[in-house]
Amino acid sequence: MIVSPCDAPKTPVKRLRSALLASSALVCLFSAGQLWAFSLDDVAAKAKEMAGQKFEAPRSNLPNELRDMKFADYQKIRFRDDKAEWAGDKTPFKVSFYHQGMHFDTPVKINEVTATSVDEIKYDASRFDFGGLNIDPKTSEKLGYAGFRVLYPINKDDKQDEIMTMLGASYFRVIGKGQVYGLSARGMAIDTASPSGEEFPRFKEFWIEKPGPDDNHLVIFALLDSPRATGAYQLTLRPGTNTLVDVKSRMFLRDKVNKLGVAPLTSMFLFGANQPSRVPNYRRELHDSSGLSIQAANGEWLWRPLNNPKHLSISSFSVENPRGFGLLQRGRDFSQYEDLDDRYDKRPSAWIEPKGDWGKGTVELVEIPTADETNDNIVAFWKPETLKAPGEEMAFDYRLHWTMQENSIHSPDLGWVKQTQRSIGDVRQSNLIRQPDGSLAFLVDFVGPVLAALPEDKTIRSQVTTDDNVELVENNLRYNPVTKGYRLTLRVKVKDAGKATEMRAYLLREIPAEPGKEPALLVADKADEKKAAAKEAAAKEAAKPAVAKESANDQVEIAKADAPKPEAAKPEAGKADASKADAAKGDVAKADAAKADDVAKGKDGKDIQQPATEAAPTHPEPAKTLQVMTETWSYQLPSDE
């Protein structure tokens, strides 16, 4: 017979009876805790159930006096710090709330989760100071909270600072120590930049686990709803110098979507060094993020500087199981921004680190025209290649890094782009005066420990590709003693300003070849070997003039990419290794062609061997190969620039 510890019979043995009673109390307490255990599975069950039901649009409960208020008036509504959730408890985390107002017209349900219960945190008007606004108390009786903030002593032990905000749709922003709010993350994006219009899912309910006195993390669950999708999320917030958010997401479709955005990031780019302001401005740069960074599964890195285009621009980068991607703010010098109010130099980068197998898909970058910095015009997200049928679960887990230490994200084995500068191209005349020549100049600074360890290495060269919409008139690589890196200067002449132009560049280094071994980043996939062989043969045909040009001008070869298809130039980060291998093999082909120049021609056209003194040495130089030294700079010059 199996006896439940909660109903254990009495025993005449006193010590045994005491032991059983103690065991009974522990097991019953554990059972009670298990009864109230709350997890992502509970939220996922709700999301799955909703996905099988018709979408119910949220209804606004705002009175006109709150709905029609201006932003300046909305800001007057202050939350009372002494009324924060857990204000009297010994926990490092506190939670305060946003009042409804303006377009934040629909309340969200917020619950507190403890070891024994799940309870709704009810709206309480006494938690707010309305700043002299004439708000009728009766009109606010049935209101709710629009969202919430998380407070934590991240900068000083005796001061609670706001480190996370959840307000509007599925947006949330996070900062680390010494940072100020910048770009946002979202739970989900649907049909971003589609002709049919974007759908904005919203978090409709939250569950916040009450932390203990010594807890250094906060767990938040969220239920997402939208006309064509639902979702369940677990966000574990870990404050620090680099604040982390571990995200577990479970998504369900209600209906077909054209484009599902996973781990979306939203930012702002008005102007910067690569696209200067069209009107005079004391701020040289004004943006929350300066570029998109991607790390492919094969270890290659790609950097895409952002633009504020005149027309909507969408770029797709094919990557299978990416190691990471994000919108980064490269450049932390105050002198780059000169803004004492908005401190763009302290705005964090956001880096997405996928967990598990994400499969095939693309990282998509959307750049939207904007006239001022109040509009978020940059979106980046992961778009899965295939989606599951409505009602079936899709799981995407990832870690979100909010950091100002971008160098710690990047691989130390490769250099990266510190900055991209753009200016009018010019040529120095015989009188030493620089004269514009109708070209555009791009100066790309590559830096990093791997480059700093090789100062003025003459074996480092650039590999540049462009589409057919530009003429590349200069490709010059110089050592930069200030950054201990290399500066690549490109001058281009655009053929059709009405078309966007694609350019790519990275640095290579000539190293001795190891028998039977090639640098990993220069080895093409087996499927591409035939294509590489064909390109090598073509390179041999063109090698003589190319080598002669390089020798005369002391410049590296300028490679041209195939013309883009009519739709758009869509870079594919996942295929870049093969192209790098082709480029390296092409250089080997040039060497072969150069050797052919040692064979002279007679008057009758027959080959004449050179004298024996000109023959190849008995001990030829060791074979050389090329090693990729930097990430790939991938730049799009927008149309009508």
From Swiss-Prot:
Q: Does the keyword Signal apply?
A: yes
Named in its record, the pathway it takes part in is:
Glycan metabolism; osmoregulated periplasmic glucan (OPG) biosynthesis
Pfam families the record matches = MdoG (PF04349)
Instruction: Tell me where in or outside the cell this protein is found.
Output: Periplasm
| Signal sequence range | 1-37
Disordered: where is this region? 535-554, 561-625
Instruction: Give the Gene Ontology MF terms in alphabetical order.
Output: carbohydrate binding; catalytic activity
Q: Which Gene3D superfamilies match?
A: 2.70.98.10, Immunoglobulins
Point to the regions of Basic and acidic residues compositional bias. Answer: 561-607
List keywords of the entry alphabetically: Periplasm, Signal
| One GO cellular component term noted in the UniProt record for this chain | outer membrane-bounded periplasmic space
Q: Which InterPro entries match?
A: Gal_mutarotase_sf_dom, GH-type_carb-bd, Glucan_biosyn_MdoG/MdoD, Glucan_biosyn_MdoG_C, Ig-like_fold, Ig_E-set, MdoG_OpgG
Instruction: Tell me one GO biological process term.
Output: beta-glucan biosynthetic process
The task this protein performs is described as: Involved in the biosynthesis of osmoregulated periplasmic glucans (OPGs).
Q: Which family does it belong to?
A: Belongs to the OpgD/OpgG family.
HAMAP family linked:
MdoG_OpgG (MF_01069)
Q: What is this protein called?
A: Glucans biosynthesis protein G
Organism of provenance: Pseudomonas syringae pv. tomato (strain ATCC BAA-871 / DC3000)
